[in-house]
């Protein structure tokens, strides 16, 4: 019985990155032996055990055989006869197929260390194509290690295209797809995740609403990058620079879905695209089972981002209506999220990356003025029932109007 540290912990150690989780591989043992040593079995499909003291995962060496569609369509064989190399052979990438024994010796049968040094994401074997989830995993690794200079091997990208052209991606559950998206949205370069999916053909299969944006033109005056798909990923990249909030990043990703529905005869203009995109966002979120709060923010950003861009031109009454519709009175954090997403939208254009976004501070001050209206004073003045709401609305409009009069700075309207 031999125990090895495997997977991400070994890889991240070689990259001098912090190690989050440690996974161990046990060669030459049976489930009965593990139980006798005090380990607790938790794996249903294959033998995985928790250490009796530190609760870390220890998996018995196994091989896998493809028997059906999807990432779950495998038959696993765990036995004391399965060797270290046989277990490592079933892994996705060479950089994840390195083992370290208890004395610190490294075992690298597939040249993962060489690929780490070359900053290369390369598949271990042609069995890579048997698991469609690996398309998403490789895209996530490409995004995660983008700043370190990693790129996908041409032959691996070819296999990812092969998977995308088959029916395998459709066998992935919504939960697994969203899990990979969620992890990528939390990383430093989520835009790379979607760029890779676009390159290998998976974006069209899994995210057709986003894929449809590529090739759709925008006015060059406001969008020198022209292509809406390119703009979308630029906005996502800017959102990642502005905030770690994954809901804001997702909202940035889907804020322009409605532009794919603009009539061709009207291009490159996209009148009302924010509202046109709402059904698309709802459908995408339902399909992927996106959390409700994330979905609701995405809908808000799509619906209101054009108004936010034109904030200096809006009447006080319109501004208060926006605050009412978004229920910022009870959820003021949503205003901050909306402004962050709109700032990313403004900066996600060629040549605009470092521009200021005064609309954000302007709307924040408008909200503070409106929210400062004293409801108790309205009630004390004798208003009752529906009159209270009407009086509150009028006083909020007046508060915003007075603030607007103090403002001197005006920006030209952006038709984005």
UniProtKB/Swiss-Prot annotation:
GO MF annotations in UniProt: ATP binding; CCA tRNA nucleotidyltransferase activity; cyclic-nucleotide phosphodiesterase activity; magnesium ion binding; phosphatase activity; tRNA binding
Classification via InterPro entries: CCA_bact, HD/PDEase_dom, HD_domain, NT_sf, PolA_pol_head_dom, PolyA_RNA-bd, tRNA_CCA-adding_enzyme
Catalytic activity: a tRNA precursor + 2 CTP + ATP = a tRNA with a 3' CCA end + 3 diphosphate; a tRNA with a 3' CCA end + 2 CTP + ATP = a tRNA with a 3' CCACCA end + 3 diphosphate
Domain of life of the organism encoding this protein: Bacteria
CDD domains: HDc, NT_ClassII-CCAase
Subunit composition and interactions: Monomer. Can also form homodimers and oligomers.
Family membership noted in the UniProt record: Belongs to the tRNA nucleotidyltransferase/poly(A) polymerase family. Bacterial CCA-adding enzyme type 1 subfamily.
Remaining remarks: A single active site specifically recognizes both ATP and CTP and is responsible for their addition.
Protein name as annotated: Multifunctional CCA protein
Annotated keywords: ATP-binding, Hydrolase, Magnesium, Metal-binding, Multifunctional enzyme, Nickel, Nucleotide-binding, Nucleotidyltransferase, RNA repair, RNA-binding, Transferase, tRNA processing
Binding-site list for ATP: 8, 11, 91, 137, 140
Entry's Gene Ontology BP terms: RNA repair; tRNA 3'-terminal CCA addition
Note describing how the cofactor binds: Magnesium is required for nucleotidyltransferase activity. Nickel for phosphatase activity.
Domain comment as written in the entry: Comprises two domains: an N-terminal domain containing the nucleotidyltransferase activity and a C-terminal HD domain associated with both phosphodiesterase and phosphatase activities.
Organism listed in the record: Shewanella baltica (strain OS185)
Role of this protein: Catalyzes the addition and repair of the essential 3'-terminal CCA sequence in tRNAs without using a nucleic acid template. Adds these three nucleotides in the order of C, C, and A to the tRNA nucleotide-73, using CTP and ATP as substrates and producing inorganic pyrophosphate. tRNA 3'-terminal CCA addition is required both for tRNA processing and repair. Also involved in tRNA surveillance by mediating tandem CCA addition to generate a CCACCA at the 3' terminus of unstable tRNAs. While stable tRNAs receive only 3'-terminal CCA, unstable tRNAs are marked with CCACCA and rapidly degraded.
Residue ranges constituting the HD domain according to the UniProt record: 228-329
EC number in record: 2.7.7.72, 3.1.3.-, 3.1.4.-
Residues that, per the record, bind CTP: 8, 11, 91, 137, 140
Cofactor names: Mg(2+); Ni(2+)
Alphabetical list of NCBIfam families matching this protein: PRK10885.1
Originating gene: cca
Residues involved in Mg(2+) binding: 21, 23
Pfam families: HD (PF01966), PolyA_pol (PF01743), PolyA_pol_RNAbd (PF12627)
């Amino acid at each position: 019985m031999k125990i090895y540290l495997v997977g991400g912990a070994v890889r991240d150690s070689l990259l001098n990155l912090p190690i989050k989780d440690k996974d161990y591989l046990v060669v030459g043992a049976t489930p009965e032996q593990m139980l006798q040593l005090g380990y607790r079995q938790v794996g249903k499909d294959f033998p995985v055990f928790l250490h009796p003291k530190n609760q870390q995962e220890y998996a018995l060496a196994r091989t896998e055989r493809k028997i059906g569609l999807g990432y779950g369509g495998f038959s696993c064989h765990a036995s004391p006869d399965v060797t270290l190399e046989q277990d490592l052979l079933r892994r996705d990438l060479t950089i994840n197929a390195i083992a370290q024994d208890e004395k610190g010796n490294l075992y690298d049968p597939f040249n993962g260390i060489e690929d780490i040094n070359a900053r290369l994401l390369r598949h271990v074997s042609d069995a890579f194509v048997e698991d469609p989830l690996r398309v998403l995993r490789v895209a996530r690794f490409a995004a995660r290690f983008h700043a370190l200079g990693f790129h996908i091997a041409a032959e691996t990208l070819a296999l990812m295209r092969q998977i995308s052209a088959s029916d395998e991606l459709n066998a992935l559950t919504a939960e697994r797809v969203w899990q990979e998206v969620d992890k990528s949205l939390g990383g430093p370069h989520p835009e790379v995740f979607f760029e890779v999916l676009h390159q290998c053909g998976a974006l069209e299969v899994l995210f057709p609403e986003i894929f449809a944006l590529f090739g759709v033109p925008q006015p060059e005056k406001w969008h020198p990058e022209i292509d809406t798909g390119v703009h979308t990923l630029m906005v996502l990249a800017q959102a990642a620079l502005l905030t770690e909030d994954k809901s804001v990043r997702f909202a940035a990703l889907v804020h322009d879905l409605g532009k794919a529905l603009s009539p061709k005869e009207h291009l490159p203009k996209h009148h009302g695209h924010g509202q046109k995109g709402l059904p698309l966002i709802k459908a995408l979120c339902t399909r992927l089972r996106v959390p409700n709060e994330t979905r609701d923010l995405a809908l808000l950003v799509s619906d209101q981002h054009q108004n936010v861009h034109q904030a200096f031109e809006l009447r006080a009454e319109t501004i208060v209506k926006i605050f009412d519709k978004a229920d910022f009175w009870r959820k003021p954090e949503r205003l901050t999220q909306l402004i962050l997403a709109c700032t990313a939208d403004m900066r996600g254009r060629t040549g605009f990356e470092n521009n200021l976004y005064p609309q954000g501070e302007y709307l924040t001050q408008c909200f503070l003025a409106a929210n400062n209206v004293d409801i108790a004073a309205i009630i004390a003045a004798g208003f009752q029932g529906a009159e209270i709401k009407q009086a509150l609305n009028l006083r909020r409009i007046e508060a915003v109007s007075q603030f607007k009069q103090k403002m001197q700075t005006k920006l030209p309207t952006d038709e984005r």
